[in-house]
Every structure is written in structure tokens, then in C-alpha cells.
Design a protein with these regions (language model features):
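Local sequence-structure signature of Cys/Sec-based thiol-disulfide redox active-site neighborhoods
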Residues: 27-35
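Extracytoplasmic electron-transfer domains, predominantly the class I c-type cytochrome c fold
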Residues: 39, 44-48, 54-103
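Gram-negative bacterial Sec-dependent N-terminal signal peptides
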Residues: 3-21
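Intrinsically disordered, low-complexity sequence elements enriched in Ser/Thr/Gly/Pro
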Residues: 1-3, 217
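The N-terminal extracellular segments of secreted preproproteins, especially immediately downstream
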Residues: 11, 20, 36-39, 242
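Predominantly soluble domains enriched in secretory-pathway, periplasmic, or organellar proteins
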Residues: 19, 23-27, 43, 67-72, ...
């Protein structure tokens, strides 16, 4: 099936059926699912961050329970309330549609079809000659990327002042961005709709250079440390696509439609996390549904799989690498198994499973970018993840033993740190609405929570976690987002959306801010925190946690990526 036609054909195949379940509802269930639900539950309803919504999984549940989950959300999960958008009839209709949904798609990873979508958008070599140095910033290392999930945008921000430089359409629900560490003027993004895009962040306006449709639904992305190759991972069709990092020409497809799972059965698997490593010429590729990790050697002809590490755990998700100094730097690929509540430790050197770190019953580890740092007090390297299902930060050492569990107010998705901050910054974005507006600042030496960033509907606070004393307050007034239509860029053929820092009207009914993903910026002096529900990014002092200012007029900002910071993080 042609990748470019998958979305429209899938929608058409179920559109007629949607009217059968509407009752008195006029909701277009396929369209609503595609826009609002697909990101967490998948295009073929197989689940991911969200639950499996295929009929066989749903038939075990009562319809009224499912309807209530749509209307009221599910506490300590990523499932929000939809009562602002759904009537009870709408929710009943959606449940009926899901219960009777049939997968009529036939996805297969085909390298020739993928090559047919490869598109040149600007002349890379000409731009490099014309603009040998960064134009819009002092250095390309000053750039921070941000994704606006629901607007399908990649933004480029000058991290030294918070100025939004440009915003680019880059596929539905842009998920991950990375940079080429050998030549950091080149950046890449992957959207959940399977579009891989390459940008030149030194040229004016950060133009898109090329794009290729690697699948229908994608997640992971990694660039080899030698700067030659970029690899993207797919949920649908299962597999990964390796491309030339200077052109995006597709070179090889790794099909995972028939792999051995944890039960010894042959089935298709989605590809979750991907990571390069400075330890050797390897990519790690996590097979989400098979509980195993492939290790690819990109230095050899035809880029073979040279390692196959099985039995890690059920439902593999995101991962990060260790930062132990010396020869073991980047040696271990630490992958979350959300179905088995473990962090699997995959050894690039031995190409085996070195250990499993059990995070606790039903914790569902989700490290996001993860954290690895040297604890001077203990005299050893430590690593940390947050947990989706409970408010818990789990810390372990390089002997793969847990050294501390730190409670927070709710489940999280991201935990980050950097040399210039004394803290681990842990979000609680999957917690309850009463607490998902908090980020915990955990002391990297004492492993105790020192401070909490808490943003209310009108006021933000920095709180001393021990005394509960408010250390700082700031104006957190919410403003309507000022939007612009798509337009043509100064250079290239992609579409951009203009930005203004002019504030819109004050929001009449403010919402609870939902904070996530802390990322260093401005040479480590700042930390950026995204706010999903308010459409802005907060900037804070890295060493103190004090608020500085907001970047407004964004739509569900999610992932941020500092080029300078990630240059020194293995696999990031």
C-alpha cells in the first residue's frame, strides 16, 4: 500500500461505518480519533502510551465504564477528561465505533515505496557555501528545538534570549528531534505520521532540506556519531528505516512484521526507542512488542544486525544511555519495559542483557530523556527514571542496584538534568489535575526534593519542599494564542507558520497548566519547561529554579532539545 495514501484510505474505509454508531450524535468518530486519540492509542488502535483499543481488548470491559473513561478521564494515566468536547451520546457512539472497528489496512515496509516519497526541499550544498556560519544566532549550538504537538510544528528558538526564530510544518504530531553531532547545523525531526525531515539551522529561517515518508506512524530517531546515517523507527508498519544523514536517501529497511515475542510466538512488533552510541558503530533498536533489542552495525556493508538481545520485558518504550566517565561512557542502553516494570540494561559491548532493574509493581517506568550523573557523596554514577502510573522517581547505580525511590505528587513522563544544575527536574504530567502543574527539583547529591515549581491558573510559585515556604511568585496570567496561517518560507519548499510575541486577549476561563519536559538552555544557565494546556514554555534559572519569563503563543509545546546540551549526551 502506498504510504502517501494510507491516511486517506484508512479514513475512508471507516467513515461510512461511523454513521452507524452515532445514535443522536453527529460526531465524525474516525476524524476525532485520528486527531485526538491516535497519538497515544495508535492508528490501528493497538495502544502505546494509551491502552489497546482493539475490539478483543475492549470486549472485556463494560460499555458504561469505557464511556465514563472518555468523559471523566483516568487518574494517574495520560487519559484526560473529554467532557468539554464529548456529550454522553458522543461518548457512547465512540465506544460503539471502537467496539466494532475492523482493521482493513495491510501495511508492509517497502524500501522502494519509501524511496518514492524522498523529496528534496532545498539545496544543502549551496546553502552551506552561502552561509558557512549561523545567520540567526551566534552559533548553531545556541539553538533549541521545540515541538508543537497538536499544530504539527517544529520550532527553532534562540536559547540565549528565548526568541522564536522559525516554525515549520513537519508532519502530524511531531514527536522527536535530534541533531547531527559531527555537523550540528543539520537537524532532524520525526512525526507520528511518519515524516522524517532534515533542516539546516545555520541558514536563515532554518529551512527544511529534505523529507521522506518512512511509515504511517513513527516514533524513534537517532543519528550516528560519525554524522553519516540517520535511522527512524516505525510503529506502523513495524520496522526501521536507515537513511543517508546528508541527503535523507533511504538506504535500508528493517522489517519487524515477523519476530519472536516474549512467549516464543511469531508476531509483528512496533519499534520504540532508537539510540546511537559513542561506544561503537552501533544503533540500538527496541522492538516494543517482542521484548528484545536489535543492535545494528552501520560500519559494515549493508548495515547488518549484529546483536539480538531477547527477553527484556513486555512493552518496551523509551531509553537512555549511561554517562559513566571513561571507557564505559555510553556502553549501556537502558530501556523501559512498561509491561514488566523494569529498566532493561543492554550491553553494547557484550550484546547481551546485563541486568534488569525492577522499578516496582505497576510503576510503568518512562524516563523520557532520562538522567545519568555522578554523585560525589556516594562516589558513583547514578541513573533515574520517573514512573507513569505512580508519583515515583527511581534511582539506581551502575551495579544495577536501586539506591533510592523518591515520591512525587503524580506520574511523570520526563526527568532531566545537566552539569549546570544541582537538580533532577521531574515532571508529574500524568498525575491528577490537582498536581500535574508541578515539577520536582530533586537534589542530585542528597536525593531529596529541595524545591517544587508549581504553576496555577493565575500565579506561579517556587516552593521550598521541606518548609513549604513560597520562595518566589510570578504572574502566570494566560492569554489567547495568536495564530497565523501557513505560508511559504524564505528558502526551500516546506511550509512555515509565522510567530509573534505579541500577547492575545486574556483567557476568560484559565485552565490548570500541565507541565512537562525540562531541558537546559542558554549554556546551561536556563531550564525550559513546556506547558501543554496553556500553550507556552516557561524559562527558569537552572541553579535556583527561579522563574524568568514565558515564551507564549504556542500550541501544546512538548519536546524541547538543546543542541549544545545534547552534543555531550550519548545517544541523545
Amino acid at each position: 500500500m502506498k504510504l502517501g495514501r494510507v491516511l486517506s484510505l484508512t479514513a475512508c474505509s471507516v467513515l461510512a461505518a461511523s454513521s452507524l454508531f452515532a445514535g443522536s450524535s453527529t460526531m465524525n468518530f474516525p476524524n476525532v480519533y485520528e486527531k485526538e486519540c491516535q497519538g497515544c492509542h495508535g492508528p490501528i488502535h493497538q495502544g502505546g502510551v494509551g491502552s489497546d483499543l482493539r475490539p478483543d481488548a475492549l470486549k472485556k470491559k463494560e460499555r458504561h465504564v469505557l464511556r465514563d473513561a472518555i468523559m471523566n478521564g483516568m487518574q494517574n494515566t495520560a487519559m484526560p477528561k473529554w467532557d468539554h468536547m464529548f456529550s454522553k451520546d458522543d461518548a457512547d457512539g465512540m465506544v460503539d465505533w471502537l467496539m466494532d472497528w475492523k482493521d482493513n489496512t495491510n501495511f508492509k515496509l517497502d524500501l522502494d515505496e519509501i524511496k518514492g516519497t524522498w523529496t528534496k526541499l532545498a539545496d544543502r550544498e549551496e546553502l552551506a557555501k552561502k552561509y558557512p556560519n549561523a545567520v540567526d544566532t551566534k552559533s548553531v549550538l545556541d539553538v533549541t528545538f521545540a515541538t508543537e504537538r497538536d499544530a504539527s510544528l517544529v520550532d527553532f528558538i534562540d536559547s540565549t534570549n528565548g526568541k522564536v526564530l522559525s516554525r515549520h510544518k513537519a508532519g502530524f504530531a511531531v514527536h522527536v528531534t535530534v541533531t547531527n553531532k559531527t555537523n550540528p547545523r543539520y537537524a532532524y525531526s520525526i512525526s507520528r505520521s511518519g515524516r522524517l525531515t532534515m533542516f539546516d539551522i545555520a541558514a536563515p529561517g532554518q529551512p527544511a532540506l529534505a523529507s521522506v515518508q518512512v511509515g504511517y506512524e513513527s516514533r524513534g530517531l537517532a543519528v550516528s556519531p560519525d554524522g553519516k546515517y540517520v535511522i527512524a523507527g516505525n510503529y506502523t508498519p513495524g520496522g526501521a528505516v536507515l537513511c543517508d544523514a546528508m541527503t535523507l536517501e533511504p538506504l535500508k529497511a528493517y522489517d519487524t512484521s515477523a519476530v519472536i515475542n516474549m512467549k516464543g510466538q511469531i508476531e509483528s512488533s512496533r519499534v520504540a526507542s532508537l539510540a546511537d552510541t559513542p561506544y561503537g558503530p552501533y544503533f540500538a533498536m527496541a522492538l516494543k512488542d517482542a521484548g528484545r533489542v536489535y543492535i545494528i552495525d552501520y560500519s559494515k556493508p549493508n548495515f547488518p544486525i549484529v546483536g539480538d538481545v531477547p527477553n527484556i520485558g513486555e512493552v518496551l518504550h523509551d531509553a537512555f544511555l549511561n554517562e559513566d566517565k571513561g571507557e564505559d561512557f555510553g556502553r549501556y542502553f537502558m530501556i523501559a519495559s512498561q509491561g514488566s516494570d523494569v529498566m532493561g540494561i543492554v550491553d553494547y559491548k557484550e550484546k547481551n542483557l546485563a541486568a534488569k532493574v525492577y522499578t516496582g509493581d505497576k510503576t510503568k517506568p518512562h524516563p523520557g530523556q532520562g538522567s545519568s550523573w555522578f554523585n560525589k557523596t556516594m562516589g558513583k554514577q547514578l541513573h533515574a527514571t520517573v514512573s507513569m502510573n505512580v508519583g515515583l522517581v527511581v534511582v539506581w547505580d551502575s551495579n544495577w542496584e536501586i539506591v533510592k525511590k523518591i515520591e512525587t505528587s503524580g506520574g511523570g513522563l520526563f526527568i532531566g538534568t545537566a552539569p549546570d544544575t544541582p537538580y533532577l527536574w521531574a515532571d508529574t504530567v500524568i498525575g491528577s489535575p490537582e498536581t500535574y502543574n508541578e515539577v520536582y527539583l530533586i537534589n542530585k547529591e542528597t536525593l531529596e526534593t529541595d524545591k517544587i515549581v508549581k504553576v496555577g491558573k493565575k500565579e506561579g510559585q517556587l516552593i521550598d519542599a521541606k518548609t513549604k515556604k513560597v520562595l518566589q511568585t510570578w504572574d502566570a496570567t494566560q492569554y489567547e494564542t495568536v495564530t497565523f496561517p501557513e505560508s511559504d518560507p524564505q528558502i526551500g519548499k516546506d511550509k512555515i507558520v509565522k510567530y509573534t510575541d505579541k500577547l492575545g486577549e486574556k483567557v476568560k476561563e484559565p485552565v490548570q497548566p500541565r507541565l512537562l519536559h525540562a531541558e537546559p538552555a542558554n549554556h546551561g544557565k536556563w531550564t525550559m519547561i513546556s506547558e501543554w494546556t496553556t500553550g507556552r514554555i516557561g524559562i527558569y534559572e537552572s541553579d535556583s529554579g527561579k522563574f524568568i519569563k514565558y515564551i507564549n503563543n504556542l500550541t501544546t509545546p512538548t519536546f524541547t532539545y538543546s543542541v549544545e546540551h545534547r552534543q555531550h549526551i550519548p545517544g541523545a
